[in-house]
Amino acid sequence: MPTPVRRRYDGSEVKLYCEIAMNDWFVTYRGIVLPRHCDHYGHMNVRYYAQFFDDGGFQMLHHAGISQQSLKERGIGLVVANVNIDFVAEIKAGELMRIEGAYRRIGGKSLAHEQRMYAAENDRLCATQTETEVFFDVQKRASAAMPDDIRALIEPLVIGSGDS
């Protein structure tokens, strides 16, 4: 079976090895919880959930074939308008983590995505993050409409909020 190929925003091709895996959820981050990530209760401190989800968030556009450089060249970017983290179960030092992401909604100027953090060795759900990002004109310092070509790359990846 041939490897799926998707066009990036800049026109080049990227091979996608897991495009349809896990109901369109895809891995955005992998790591390990270190002792320095833990608080006085022995589990990962909330500040690091935000850090790891943020790192994973940059992979969302990359997965759609959109590079940070291509946005910069057009004078647009994305800024976070809202972020919410729900803590489900502890994750402790020495545990491997895996974060998966999915696009949930797309609007005229914004998009929403969700990421889920799992303890990788047993697939225990540890936290979820929902985030809304707004397209931003970096010169005008104001929100901007989502370009049609970017919409065309993201829209097929949206799975909706009711899908698991």
Feature locations, PLM:
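Beta-strand/loop substructures that line and gate deep hydrophobic ligand-binding cavities in soluble
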Residues: 124-130
